[in-house]
Regions:
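NUDIX/MutT-family hydrolases
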Residues: 106-142
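Short, charged/polar surface micro-motifs in flexible loops or helix N-caps
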Residues: 18-23, 32-33, 45-46, 74-79, ...
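A generic structural micro-feature
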Residues: 5-9, 36, 84-90, 115-120
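Conserved Nudix-box catalytic region and its N-terminal flanking loop in Nudix hydrolases
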Residues: 23-60
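A short coil-to-beta-strand element that immediately follows conserved catalytic motifs
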Residues: 65-74
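Active-site-adjacent beta-strand/loop module that shapes the phosphate/pyrophosphate-binding cleft
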Residues: 79-108, 147
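Charged phosphate-binding loop/patch that engages nucleotide di/tri-phosphates or the phosphate backbone
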Residues: 134-156
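Conserved N-terminal beta-strand and adjoining loop/helix that marks the start
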Residues: 2-24, 43, 95
């Protein structure tokens, strides 16, 4: 455990969507002056269950509905938030499948933000390979990719 004073838990829920081309959907974002790449998802709201929170995040960000396929990972070590050092992250990852097609634009190049929106995020498919680990920014995402991407890739 860290020596810093932890004031709050920050519960995050993420969905990994794979396609037939051995790719996983990732999101590139810019916030607080930082650029980062992660799996789609976000923070749980008070009074919300994990599955409902994940489905809400996908609807908000990608304008699509998903079903939960299976639980992949829950953080089992201390991780401070990159944006709020006094917050301890608890991250839960699921494999998801689409109920209907994604309406949001899927980009080809990283950080291809639209000039017409204030929110800087864009989605793209990333090849399920060792290079995925270099593309992901946050330690828990890298751990999930390392532990589960090869297994899921073989199931596709």
């Amino acid at each position: 455990m860290s020596n810093m004073k932890i004031e709050k838990f920050n519960i995050r829920v993420y969905g990994l969507l794979f396609n037939r081309n051995n790719e996983v959907l990732v999101v590139d974002e810019e916030e607080y002056g930082l650029r980062f790449t992660k799996f789609p998802g976000g923070g749980l709201e008070f009074g919300e269950g994990l599955h409902d929170g994940l489905k809400r995040e996908w609807m908000e960000e990608l304008q699509t509905e998903v079903d939960i396929v299976r639980h992949l990972y829950t953080t089992d070590f201390f991780q401070a938030s990159a944006f709020n050092p006094g917050h301890q992250l608890i991250s839960i990852y699921y494999e998801v499948k689409l109920i209907r097609p994604i309406e949001a634009t899927i980009h080809i190049h990283p950080f291809s933000f639209s000039d017409t929106t204030t929110e800087k995020l864009c989605f793209r498919w990333a090849q399920v390979s060792d290079s995925l680990l270099q593309q992901l920014t946050f330690p828990i995402d890298k751990l999930v990719a390392e532990q589960f991407v090869d297994t899921i890739k073989n199931d596709i």
